[in-house]
């Protein structure tokens, strides 16, 4: 992204913003029309802004009346006020820069086209035809709505019960900051300083990677009530680590010998995440919301109660029928010390709650601002509405909304990945002799796994147990909303705070979650703000995913990357709007440096 435009003349001579853009590839056939439509709109906007900006120059000189240049977009009547002219220049220049970003391929795993019965596709809430099977007429009404985007078509989707789909039209919303969702896909995005693939296709149903992720989910379901600090001595955790170590497609962190250890289970692999306790310091250190004390103890759910482990209940939930079951509360508030606790937290949290709380904790423990903050060394000023506390807090909240609509586009209009509960149902059908009712088959690595056998021994069936009576939310799995919000929000916090700051006096929840005790591990002096921000992103997204059984590991990993890319895009846009001159560097999730500058 270029630096802020310093004059209207510079801005309005930027021509052909989109005409010369080179695409990085084609969308998958399934999604080509949707991607093409969104690309066409962005192209029209870019062309109009480039050509219309030149037209606008003449308008400014001759004071002609406003002119419509695209449906809903007008070149305004000129004004002599320099601030309005400057504001207009910044807005048009920013839109020009965004419209130049190429549109990458939007590549799915191919399962929707591969299986006629749609057993590998998200269909929850639609009228079902059997375990793992959707009513195909209902599915066609669903796809008609997604393909048309017509609000009336969404009202004609054939549902199986009273539960409604969770906001599919949010994915069609446009934003006024940052690049568009369609500009982030199965390619890197150098314009947003992200050089890894942003949103690769999810693992396909029959792949070893899919099977490995499902094995991990079965183990997580069996460890839901075990304190993270107890994993090191827990026999089930040891079995889980041993089995996952032997799976080449396991994507989680390993030790220096290539092994998964009990203390590495269900962790992310970004820098700093394997240092210190499982739970981020930002989730447990007491803080203040103004004058309100926050001790970070949470209401959680009673241990040992899981759901959707019989065919009748499973099928009710897939149809969107209320089973009448409800989560039972643990009467004792606890610190986040187990998978069930994280699941309960993320079941009820406000969209950006964890990251706003993290912002409060960073202030409580005295983390300095990012050294690139223009007020870091000022003798006469401090930041406030810009580069100060109100800016910090408001930007964390704002980016969450942008991130959610971005990921909703990918969920509903590209990938339609089904939920782990559906994968567990396929395992169950195959292992109970009903596999021929389905077109798809999962990999033998999950069918023959110790995890599935241990789950059957506990529950008496092969379904993947769920921490919530309703199972997953009624939106597709990939990517995950909690993950993209995590990636976006931690990027904002890295932009504003000094990520290299070492967190003093780290703590860890006790085994029962009733108290905090000092963390005395040998790596206690290596726990940094950057590492704990990376860690909280996985804590919260896995807390909403792997631990309760409603998301896959790859949902989170891709989502955090997507959120980071979007946040960098928004920060680059906002850099144009600040009066202060600055250059801010921060460390991305891959360990490399991003730079936001308007100098």
Q: Which residue stretches match the model-derived regions?
A:
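N-terminal secretory signal peptides
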Residues: 1-36, 62
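Intrinsically disordered, low-complexity segments enriched in glycine/proline and serine/threonine
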Residues: 17-18, 26-29, 37, 47, ...
